[in-house]
């Protein structure tokens, strides 16, 4: 049972919210489009003294886990809807935990960044990403923070939709865990030191 009081009180700052965009169900596990969920699982696995576990939060239609980073309460959330309908659950979980739209951190796949690279930014366009379009529409702003996990562009004439819904290639597979770890590291830097410092460290790596 989720209760606001277990996460924050009047004497402490409210929780931070990290959202991982993904499609639900086993058919989509391991696909490029689901890298945001993989990053959330990595962050949950780092929780001490034991990994954080996800449970269904029916009121917001999200899978939710609670952890701490640098002594801050952090909510990890994955919408249970399909990617192009992510916005409703993201807005609902932000409202439930009293997180301002501009403080929401969204982790997602990014075709305009080379595979294996991670980039951070606040605001900007959605680059054709239907999950981001939905989130922007529901939050009413583009000025949320994005952790962009590079999956590269599709080869040849392959459609973007087909590419992101496929699993990583055999050549890429060995490096996927490093991409996930790097993106999780970037989230922790964001939470600990803020966007500008995190950008400086991540983008110079």
For the regions a language model picked out, list residue spans one by one:
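Nucleotide and nucleotide-moiety/phosphate-recognizing core
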Residues: 2-123, 132-147, 154-159, 166, ...
